[in-house]
């Protein structure tokens, strides 16, 4: 018996300025991170088939909070603050980076990190920093090269191979795929990846259900 995750049922739970204001550190969380213009909100909306689950800001750098969404019992998606926007004051940038690093290094229920980057400008310094933090904490990483529809097929494949080669040098579990919120490219693969990361929480749910059924 298996549980199918219905990502369209995902709903907003809470926002927090840092790890100390998040709910209890339990279940499984999968975090989404990316530069302010990487298309993170659009990717989350496409993943869940909801137009406004994650608010797409006209002004990059506005999302300063950690946003928590419930997918199903024991399974959560975390939308981390966008980083790397030039017009944000340095003090605020440093605060965000500290908050991001703290979350990636100390949150016990974090079991997967999705790093989104524009396929035309991949693997900037902060993107690589996020991946290094995850690897240090033994968290698997899924890199999504977003806005893949902006490149023709040949250029898209070449960029994918280049980033995959770079990802091999990180030394951790880092997978790289292309993604297009507009065309739906890579959406099914992303759902399949999240399914595997969420699987342990769903297994606990099944055990609890079977236990309560046998008790009856």
Curated annotation (Swiss-Prot):
UniProt-listed SUPFAM superfamilies: P-loop containing nucleoside triphosphate hydrolases (SSF52540)
Binding residue positions for Mg(2+): 41, 63
Stretches of the chain forming a coiled coil according to its record: none
Paired cysteines (S-S): none
Gene3D superfamilies for this protein: P-loop containing nucleotide triphosphate hydrolases (3.40.50.300)
Pfam families per UniProt: MMR_HSR1 (PF01926)
UniProt cofactor(s): Mg(2+)
Cellular-component GO terms for this entry: cytosol
EngB-type G domain residues: 26-200
Molecular function (Gene Ontology), one example: metal ion binding
GO biological process, one term: division septum assembly
This protein's UniProt keywords: Cell cycle, Cell division, GTP-binding, Magnesium, Metal-binding, Nucleotide-binding, Septation
Leader peptide range in chain numbering: none
Binding-site residues for GTP, renumbered to this chain: 34-41, 61-65, 79-82, 146-149, 179-181
Function: Necessary for normal cell division and for the maintenance of normal septation.
Family under the similarity heading: Belongs to the TRAFAC class TrmE-Era-EngA-EngB-Septin-like GTPase superfamily. EngB GTPase family.
NCBIfam families: GTPase_YsxC (TIGR03598)
Stated name of the protein: Probable GTP-binding protein EngB
Lineage of source species: Bacteria, Pseudomonadati, Pseudomonadota, Gammaproteobacteria, Vibrionales
Gene name tied to this protein: engB
């Amino acid at each position: 018996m298996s549980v199918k995750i219905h990502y369209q049922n995902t709903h907003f739970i809470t926002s927090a300025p840092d790890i100390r204001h998040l709910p209890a550190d339990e279940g499984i969380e999968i975090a989404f991170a990316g530069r302010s213009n990487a298309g993170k909100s659009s990717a989350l909306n496409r993943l869940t088939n909801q137009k406004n689950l994650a608010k797409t800001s006209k002004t990059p750098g506005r999302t300063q909070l950690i946003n928590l969404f419930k997918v199903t019992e024991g399974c959560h998606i975390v939308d981390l603050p966008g980083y790397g926007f030039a017009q944000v004051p340095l003090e605020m940038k440093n605060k965000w980076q500290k908050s991001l690093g703290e979350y990636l290094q100390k949150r016990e229920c974090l079991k997967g990190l999705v790093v989104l980057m524009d396929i035309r400008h991949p693997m900037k310094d902060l993107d690589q920093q996020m991946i290094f933090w995850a690897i240090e904490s033994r968290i698997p990483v899924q890199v999504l090269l977003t806005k893949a529809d902006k490149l023709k097929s040949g250029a898209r494949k070449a960029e994918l191979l280049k980033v995959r080669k770079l990802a091999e040098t990180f030394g951790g579990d880092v997978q790289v795929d292309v993604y297009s919120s507009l065309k739906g490219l890579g959406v099914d693969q992303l759902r399949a990846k999240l399914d595997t990361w969420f699987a342990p929480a769903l297994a606990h749910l099944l055990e609890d259900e079977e236990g309560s059924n046998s008790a009856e």
